[in-house]
């Protein structure tokens, strides 16, 4: 049995009615473009992505968040098997991902105001 997350379960109604779930701002690229970017260059190093876009800060944070979520997925199975180190990496990754989500939300709010 595989786990399939319900992406709309924890989202506010306003976000669901907004249309696009993956792109909180019109200046940000789609998730398929980020998947292509990550598959071409690997996860971003120190939060910097390779590209020619003008708004590198929100893109790099979003790409970094996607990379962290990808890494978190790799830690789940060893955690279930009882690996203490995988459990600690999972905890640190969740904390880091939560802070990046806050930063991405703040960035999109700033972009929406301007």
From Swiss-Prot:
Region listing for Interaction with CDK2AP2, in residue ranges: 19-24
Record PTM Phosphoserine, positions in chain: 45
Post-translation changes: Phosphorylated in vitro by IKBKE at Ser-45.
Any matching Pfam family: CDK2AP
Tissue specificity as recorded in UniProt: Oral keratinocytes.
Cell compartment(s), UniProt: Nucleus; Chromosome
Bias (Polar residues) ranges: 20-36, 47-57
Gene Ontology CC terms: chromosome; cytoplasm; nucleus
The keyword Flavoprotein belongs to this UniProt entry's keyword annotation: no
The UniProt record lists the keyword Lipoprotein: no
Region (Disordered): 18-57
InterPro entries: DOC_1/2
Annotated Gene3D superfamilies: 6.10.140.1300
Entry keywords, A to Z: Cell cycle, Chromosome, Disulfide bond, Nucleus, Phosphoprotein, Transcription, Transcription regulation, Tumor suppressor
Function as written in the Swiss-Prot or TrEMBL entry: Inhibitor of cyclin-dependent kinase CDK2. Also acts as a component of the histone deacetylase NuRD complex which participates in the remodeling of chromatin.
Family matches, as PANTHER family: CYCLIN-DEPENDENT KINASE 2-ASSOCIATED PROTEIN 1, DELETED IN ORAL CANCER 1/CDK2-ASSOCIATED PROTEIN 1
UniProt family annotation: Belongs to the CDK2AP family.
Quaternary structure annotation from Swiss-Prot or TrEMBL: Homodimer. Component of the nucleosome remodeling and deacetylase (NuRD) repressor complex, composed of core proteins MTA1, MTA2, MTA3, RBBP4, RBBP7, HDAC1, HDAC2, MBD2, MBD3, and peripherally associated proteins CDK2AP1, CDK2AP2, GATAD2A, GATAD2B, CHD3, CHD4 and CHD5. The exact stoichiometry of the NuRD complex is unknown, and some subunits such as MBD2 and MBD3, GATAD2A and GATAD2B, and CHD3, CHD4 and CHD5 define mutually exclusive NuRD complexes. Interacts with monomeric unphosphorylated CDK2. Interacts with CDK2AP2. Interacts with GATAD2A. Interacts with HDAC1. Interacts with HDAC2.
Protein name: Cyclin-dependent kinase 2-associated protein 1
Organism: Mesocricetus auratus
């Amino acid at each position: 049995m595989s786990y399939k997350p319900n992406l709309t379960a924890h989202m506010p109604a306003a976000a669901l009615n907004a249309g696009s779930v993956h792109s909180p701002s019109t200046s940000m690229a789609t998730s398929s473009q980020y998947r292509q970017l990550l598959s071409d260059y690997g996860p971003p190093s120190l939060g910097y992505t390779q590209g020619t876009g003008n708004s590198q800060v929100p893109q790099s944070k979003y790409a970094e968040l996607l990379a962290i979520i990808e890494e978190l997925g790799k830690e789940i199975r060893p955690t279930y098997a009882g690996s203490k180190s995988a459990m600690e990496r999972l905890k640190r990754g969740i904390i880091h991902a939560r802070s990046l989500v806050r930063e991405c939300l703040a960035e999109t709010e700033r972009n929406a105001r301007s």
